[in-house]
Amino acid sequence: YLFIKNNTADYGGGVYARYEGEPVFNHVTVIENTAGQGGGMRFRDNANPIISNCTIKWNISSGAGGGIYCNNADPEISYTSIIANVANEGGDAVYLKINCEANFMNTTFVSNGSPESDTSSAVFCVTNCSALFTNAILWGNLGPEIEFSSTSNPNFVTVNYSDLEDGQNGIVTNDNGTISWLDGNINENPLFCNSWDWDFSLAEDSPCVGTGIAGNNMGAFDVGCGPMMSINDDLPTQFSLKQNYPNPFNPTTTIEYSL
């Protein structure tokens, strides 16, 4: 296990890889790093990362790509959580700039973005990029879950067996790309065990349990707690207040109230 923490750079606060190669990250936590581009990680020019079982959390970019910034790179990301990253110029979790092909398998995107930013989006695609989401959870991020640039070449996104907040409406194409919305997608609260304490494992009764491809779970984490307590919503919808009796009265009376 490796922690990459509290670093500052112009590009790639925690990691910067460039030129041909396939850097592999397994069981790595990239946390609380800061950069001008790619607060957590930055990849470009065919540095195609393989990222699995990782946590990318609380990173900040003063430019684009709070968690991960890719330019002409093809990331493969699986069983990874991308949590509470912030970028001032889009792509709070992931920013795909030019000619990127991204594959997200069992990845959890949650709480990315800042209320102080008017460019928030969890995943932002600029030009000629494609992104495939399988068994993914995109929930509780500020701004669109996925957004395309409105001014560059078209982008393409495929979503299957994933939980995406607001469903297809959570994807903003700006009339500049295509959505392939395949089987198995849902728009339901994933029922994280304790998001207040940054625990994004799934409750036993989460709609993401067993509903991914081949009966797998959605997201980066397995079941981590029992079922959530259900709230009884069988509340009264009508009431009546009857005439008091006797009427007139002195000194007492009875008023009947029923639900």
What residue ranges belong to the model's regions?
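Predominantly extracellular beta-rich ligand-binding scaffolds that present long acidic/polar faces
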Residues: 1-4, 17, 23-34, 41-199
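Generic secondary-structure boundary/loop-capping signal
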Residues: 183, 189, 197-199, 215-218, ...
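Residue-level marker of motif borders
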Residues: 186, 212, 240-242
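Nucleotide phosphate-binding site architecture
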Residues: 193, 209, 242
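Surface beta-loop-beta hairpin patches that serve as ligand-binding interfaces in beta-rich domains
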Residues: 196-230
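Glycine-centered coil/turn sites that cap beta-strands in beta-rich domains
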Residues: 232-245, 249-259
